Amino acid sequence: MDTIHIRGGRRLNGRIPVSGAKNAALPLMTAALLTDEPLRLTNMPRLADVRTLTKLLAELGGDVAIDRGEDADVMTIRVADIKSTTAPYEIVSQIRASFWVLGPLLARCHEAKVSLPGGCAIGARPVDLYIKGLQKMGAEIDLVEGYVLAKAPGGLKGAVIRSPIVSVGATHTLMMAAALAEGVTVLENAAREPEIGDVANCLVAMGAKIEGIGTSTLRIEGVDRLHGATHRVIADRIEAGTYAVAAAMTGGEVVLEGVEAETFEAALSVLRAAGAGVESEQGAVRIFRNGERLQATDVVTQVFPGFPTDLQAQFMALMTTAEGESEITETIFENRFMHVQELARFGANISLHGDKALVHGVEKLKGAPVMASDLRASAALIIAGLAAEGETTINRVYHLDRGFERIEAKLSACGAEIWREKAK
């Protein structure tokens, strides 16, 4: 496995182009299953998860062409004929988002066999909401030997579906399924994340009829067929937030290009409260620090527009050297504090109390050998390594490649001393 090395203590200064959002790109790829015409996606990030989902689409009968650009790719997907409605364990176990093929396959083919999902090991993350929603739309579903077997012989029917909790995955799945269902589907308590809106806008470009985009109530009037379209993937607010934290922790000044501040305003608000400077302009955000020590700031993860759980680990790293004690509360996923013991190897002082972590700020961190436990924890360890004195070695960085594109190159361009040692 590859290893990342960092010599810390350097300020970041420069400009970082923010890649297309992983959490929009993946469901957009699955939306290509809803039509037999080409779906052209621009601003596609180059990520391991994208490559894995590409394999699954090919397994189902899709043709995927990629045009390499300087900073992003253009992906054209055409699924003229679905050759298989089975998403095998070997692929789905690698990436949770591959489970999202369930809705499009069921809507277009009236049947699907999809393995229960994999991805980062952060709690149970059950798929009950997906299944119950599809059942309300008339699907017959059984769980057999680790697979979801779904059938809708007469096609899916519109329904009013109220989710007991906000679920991004369930909203994606049910919205895509409803686009080809008979009648009107209303999704109440739907997720409002920008990535949901991005997928909805793409579906509209493909001919879907969706009202309430950006709100917690989506009204989808099913149509007989969808057509091809060209759609630009929105910027990755989690990547932007990660680099914003890195800039604040190391000092200096970084301009994040191609991202709108409102998509990650909750994170920027916490940065301001901690003492970092934040200035936004059209299509860019500038992060800077005047050299004074950051102040401890409490964080509670929430669904959008609240503070995102996918930035919790990065902000914990930031708080390890802030002045005072901060309380970080994780309300979205269980078991998402696996990075705590690795941050402690840098000299961080963190104690766990159920769903809360108390971070007692220390004067400085010291470089250490550490191991990544999941995607976002990997980013937190890189941030800590950038600020720490001495050299840091991060193992198991395959997690990182699932969600961050060219992270070493982007940080190096801003003055970081960071490099990758390829596995022998």
From Swiss-Prot:
GO molecular function: UDP-N-acetylglucosamine 1-carboxyvinyltransferase activity
Active-site residues per Swiss-Prot or TrEMBL entry: 120 (proton donor)
Reactions the enzyme catalyzes: phosphoenolpyruvate + UDP-N-acetyl-alpha-D-glucosamine = UDP-N-acetyl-3-O-(1-carboxyvinyl)-alpha-D-glucosamine + phosphate
Positions that bind UDP-N-acetyl-alpha-D-glucosamine: 96, 125-129, 310, 332
Compartment(s) where it occurs, according to its Swiss-Prot or TrEMBL record: Cytoplasm
SUPFAM superfamilies: EPT/RTPC-like
Gene3D superfamilies named in the record: Enolpyruvate transferase domain
EC category: transferase
Binding annotation for phosphoenolpyruvate: 22-23
Keywords: Cell cycle, Cell division, Cell shape, Cell wall biogenesis/degradation, Cytoplasm, Peptidoglycan synthesis, Pyruvate, Transferase
Pfam family, one: EPSP_synthase
Pathway annotation: Cell wall biogenesis; peptidoglycan biosynthesis
Positions where 2-(S-cysteinyl)pyruvic acid O-phosphothioketal occurs in the chain: 120
Keyword Translocase listed: no
Similarity annotation: Belongs to the EPSP synthase family. MurA subfamily.
PANTHER family found in the cross-reference section: UDP-N-ACETYLGLUCOSAMINE 1-CARBOXYVINYLTRANSFERASE (PTHR43783:SF1)
Function: Cell wall formation. Adds enolpyruvyl to UDP-N-acetylglucosamine.
Protein's name according to its UniProt entry: UDP-N-acetylglucosamine 1-carboxyvinyltransferase
